[in-house]
Amino acid sequence: MEIIPAIDIKDGRCVRLYQGDFAQMTVYADDPVAVARSWEAQGATRLHLVDLDGARAGHPQNVDAILAITQAVQIPVQLGGGLRREQDVESALALGVERVIIGTAAIAETDLVARLLDRFGEQIVIGIDARNGLVATDGWTVTSSVKATVLAEQMANLGARRIIYTDISRDGALSGPNFAALSELITPHGPAIIASGGIASIDHVRQLAQLGVEGAIIGKALYVGAVKLAEAMAVAHMTNV
């Protein structure tokens, strides 16, 4: 299982939100490039970037910071937040991002997602963000009537090979992942699942690895020191062996 540090960017700074609430924001660093370099130096094999301003605006906002990060590190970077048009996806990939995460468009524009999957294959990752089992969109400000499990099946049928599942109520709360919801998404021949939200301890990392997810995105727990990256990577590796 891969451990993926998260870097959430707002106004060019590295921040964390509590349950996606912009009013409950903590700034962890003014320079996200330095943060990215630090995670790489500590052994990270991939970084998870979120353009929070982009998620709310519906199109990318922190382009300069994202480009600076992709130029500063040698490890692959995946990006989410406001990527809802084909040209935005193209632009993100041109910045040096390896994977692009499609969230809102997965519900709003199925034809677009099908086209993107056809064009870019594994470079497209579906982001399913759920609140009480229902998919949330538009920077988590809108909760749909679509079940996360239903959307996951639809995306798999379109050819999606990878899904990032975020439980919004757990995100930034250090309350533990939603293991039950994750287990519902893992199928023998379905898309690989990456877990995001709520990881607060090494035990959570071990449980996720045992559950069979491909990766675990960790944000707040790394920034507050509740989880050490090297230890998490070691546990994830040992559990997989």
From Swiss-Prot:
Highest taxon listed in the record's lineage: Bacteria
Q: Where in the cell is it found?
A: Cytoplasm
Give the pathway annotation.
Amino-acid biosynthesis; L-histidine biosynthesis; L-histidine from 5-phospho-alpha-D-ribose 1-diphosphate: step 4/9
Catalytic residues (positions): 8, 129
State one Pfam family annotation: His_biosynth
What GO molecular function annotation could you give as one example from this UniProt entry?
1-(5-phosphoribosyl)-5-[(5-phosphoribosylamino)methylideneamino]imidazole-4-carboxamide isomerase activity
- Main localization of the protein? cytoplasm
Record field: catalytic activity = 1-(5-phospho-beta-D-ribosyl)-5-[(5-phospho-beta-D-ribosylamino)methylideneamino]imidazole-4-carboxamide = 5-[(5-phospho-1-deoxy-D-ribulos-1-ylimino)methylamino]-1-(5-phospho-beta-D-ribosyl)imidazole-4-carboxamide
> Which top EC class applies here?
isomerase
Cellular component terms (Gene Ontology): cytoplasm
A GO BP term here is: L-tryptophan biosynthetic process
- Entry similarity comment: Belongs to the HisA/HisF family.
What's this protein's name?
A: 1-(5-phosphoribosyl)-5-[(5-phosphoribosylamino)methylideneamino] imidazole-4-carboxamide isomerase
From which source organism is this entry?
Chloroflexus aurantiacus (strain ATCC 29364 / DSM 637 / Y-400-fl)
Q: What is the lineage of its organism?
A: Bacteria, Bacillati, Chloroflexota, Chloroflexia, Chloroflexales
